[in-house]
Amino acid sequence: RLLDASVEIVAEVGWEALSMTAVSKRSGVPRQSIYKEVGTKADLGRAVVDREVGRFLALAGEELAAHPDLETGLAAAVRRVLEVGRANPVLQAVLRPGHDAGLLTLLTVDPDALLGQVTDAVMALLGDQASVAMVDTVVRLMISHLVQSTVPVEDAVMRISRVAAAFG
């Protein structure tokens, strides 16, 4: 309930306007309980990011499982993540012009908050099919296309697939 309420608030008014009081009212959980359960606003932000990352990883995992061929699986996973990401309310709120960079900082400054977590998870999904260097590169490119999309999804998928193929 807390994370759902937080996501709704972030999508409506942005991270900077989120307060524990607003989360308490929206979720029906007493404010003191939120502090005991979650901690600070930054801790809540990390929990929101972790949950959203988990959702993206689940989508990628579904595509990799449905497409056992590494090249096809990676392309399908990247496509699905980019398509869903472009409509994700948390990501859109964080990337909205004029936003407070607090939540974006969690995504970009702390490498373990996103990059390390995603790279490790994708490596676990792929096993020995791919090198750490290839997965790290694909994840970095995918995150870049999520955060600063300048081309259509299909173009991004094609570019990322070409880079992945270069790892052989």
Predicted features and spans:
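C-terminal peripheral helix-coil segments that are non-catalytic and often amphipathic
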Residues: G116-V132, D136, L141-G168
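Phosphate/oxyanion-binding loops and surfaces in catalytic or ligand/nucleic-acid-binding neighborhoods
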Residues: V84-N88, H145-Q148
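Short, hydrophobic secondary-structure boundary micro-motifs
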Residues: S19, V90-R96, E154-D155
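Amphipathic alpha-helical packing segments from all-alpha helical-bundle domains
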Residues: L57, P89, A93, A101-D136
